[in-house]
């Protein structure tokens, strides 16, 4: 089994972006990262994103709000960032605290700056196959991984495990745009294992540690693991029981070190795209 790591994929994207940035008129692209509170995973992702933006040579400003900020104050602060003409793109770290109206933010973010595809406008564009929109970065990272590995998507049977708006549904749409035959399975699916085993490409995005066992995977299948979980031993793991499928899959992505490594490079790619569309 070939282990498809994310770092070479990310580096390939980064190299292309560094060249693309040279062709941008005016100021360098400018990303705003918005974080509410001090959730460790948010802080970790923020650090990685800041590092990635520095690596490709774009501007990045972080905006941090207290976890107990009122909804009204946060919405006002968000609007100031959203309406700043110097900012090309916005990354909002989610989930927000429960007292913050996340739907209001999704509806008011400028679709041209919505780099992680949270607005209804961009989700609709992804579903319509309109390339002027932005897909969620993690969903697009799945496609980048497959392309880098030289996996032919056209005509392939693909099963996506999970139907979230963040990964499952948009990645299914991106795969269909590439002419894959896509099946989406979820917690209500009858005989999920049999449906998954029919797939030539299996994308696991359920958020359930090591749920994808050997009986889910066809011989020679390509397995892309989007899950990020903690196992019983407190170790980071994906949705796939990686060691158990080693002698079955032809290609598989690890966790950590797989799709997650590519997500911030896709974010940078979206930022450069936004700057070109000024």
Predicted features and spans:
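Positively charged, low-complexity intrinsically disordered leader regions
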Residues: 1-27
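Short, well-ordered coil/turn residues at beta-beta hairpins
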Residues: 93, 205-206, 226
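Anion-binding alpha/beta catalytic cores of soluble intermediary-metabolism enzymes, centered on
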Residues: 91-153
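Short beta-strand segments enriched in small/hydrophobic residues
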Residues: 28-38
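Short, well-structured alpha-helical segments in soluble
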Residues: 73-85
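Rossmann-fold NAD(P)-binding glycine/threonine-rich loop
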Residues: 103-123, 227-278
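Short beta-strand elements in bilobed, periplasmic/extracellular small-molecule ligand-binding domains
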Residues: 53-67, 182-184
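Glycine-rich phosphate/diphosphate-binding loop of Rossmann-like nucleotide-binding domains
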Residues: 36-50, 133-222, 231, 235-246
């Amino acid at each position: 089994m070939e282990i498809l790591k994310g770092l070479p994929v990310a580096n390939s994207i980064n190299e292309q972006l560094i060249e693309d940035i040279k062709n941008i008129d005016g100021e360098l692209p400018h990303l705003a990262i918005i974080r509410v509170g001090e959730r460790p995973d948010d802080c970790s992702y923020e650090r990685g994103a800041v590092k990635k933006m520095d690596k490709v040579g774009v501007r990045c400003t972080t905006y941090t709000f207290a976890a107990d900020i009122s909804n009204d104050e946060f919405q006002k602060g968000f609007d100031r960032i959203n309406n700043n003409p110097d900012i090309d793109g916005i990354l909002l770290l989610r989930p927000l605290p429960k007292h913050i109206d996340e739907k209001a933010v999704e509806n008011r973010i400028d679709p041209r700056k919505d780099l992680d595809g949270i607005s209804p406008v961009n989700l609709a564009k992804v579903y319509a196959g309109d390339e002027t929109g932005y897909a969620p970065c993690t969903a697009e990272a799945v496609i980048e991984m497959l392309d880098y590995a030289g996996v032919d998507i056209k005509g392939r049977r693909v099963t996506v495990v999970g139907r979230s708006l963040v990964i499952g549904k948009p990645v299914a749409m991106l795969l269909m745009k590439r002419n894959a035959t896509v099946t989406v399975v979820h917690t209500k699916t009858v005989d999920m294992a049999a449906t998954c085993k029919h797939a030539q490409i299996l994308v696991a995005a359920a958020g359930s540690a090591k749920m994808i066992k050997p009986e889910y995977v066809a011989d020679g299948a390509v397995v892309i693991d989007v899950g990020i979980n903690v196992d019983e031993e407190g170790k980071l793991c994906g949705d796939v029981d990686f060691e158990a499928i080693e002698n079955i899959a032809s290609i598989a992505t690890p966790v950590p070190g797989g799709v997650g490594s590519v997500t911030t490079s896709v974010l940078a790619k979206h930022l450069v795209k936004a700057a070109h569309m000024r």
